[in-house]
From Swiss-Prot:
UniProt protein name: Large ribosomal subunit protein uL15
Region named Disordered: 18-43
Superkingdom field: Bacteria
GO BP, sorted A to Z: translation
Recorded family membership: Belongs to the universal ribosomal protein uL15 family.
Keyword annotations: Ribonucleoprotein, Ribosomal protein, RNA-binding, rRNA-binding
HAMAP family: Ribosomal_uL15
Organism listed in the record: Treponema denticola (strain ATCC 35405 / DSM 14222 / CIP 103919 / JCM 8153 / KCTC 15104)
Pfam family, one: Ribosomal_L27A
């Protein structure tokens, strides 16, 4: 086998600075924490946004707007160019077949087909959503669309 002589360039590594070991070390006495105060005490850090006890800005400002996050639907996108390369004429495109061909990650709930690329094969597409351009191209190639609305 090969023998490698792996050395670190000079000056690339530094010894860890030991604090609180005499004033001549540069980090003696207060160990870089300054004099007294909360930050000098053990465990004396304050969270980001802490304003010394007064009502912080993020709580003073009113909540505004609407979030649909709990009901958000994540669509996994598949393009026509991908279908053209992986599928043969007359096949059905659905979640199971997409997973078998490695186009869909496991755990993806919803699938949307977009119209990037061209398609020449007659496919039956059964997905949750489909773009207008993809629908047009699939129908032009002689394919059919079975859409379960998500």
């Amino acid at each position: 086998m090969f023998e490698f002589n792996l050395t670190v360039p000079a000056g690339a590594t530094h010894k860890k600075k030991i604090v609180g070991r005499g004033s001549s070390s540069g980090w003696g006495k207060t160990s870089g924490k300054g004099h007294k105060g909360q930050q000098a005490r053990s465990g004396g850090k304050v969270y980001a946004g802490f304003e010394g006890g007064q009502m912080p800005l993020y709580r003073r400002v009113a909540k505004k707007g609407f979030s649909n996050y709990p009901f958000k639907k994540e669509f996994y996108v598949v393009n026509l160019a991908m279908l053209e390369t992986k599928y043969s004429d007359g096949e059905t495109v659905n979640k199971e077949s997409l997973m078998q061909k490695g186009l869909l990650r496991k755990g993806s709930l919803y699938v949307k087909v977009l119209g990037t690329g061209d398609i020449t094969k007659k496919l039956t597409v059964d997905v949750d959503r489909i773009s207008a351009s993809a629908k047009e191209k699939i129908e032009k190639a002689g394919g059919t669309i079975v859409q379960s609305e998500a």
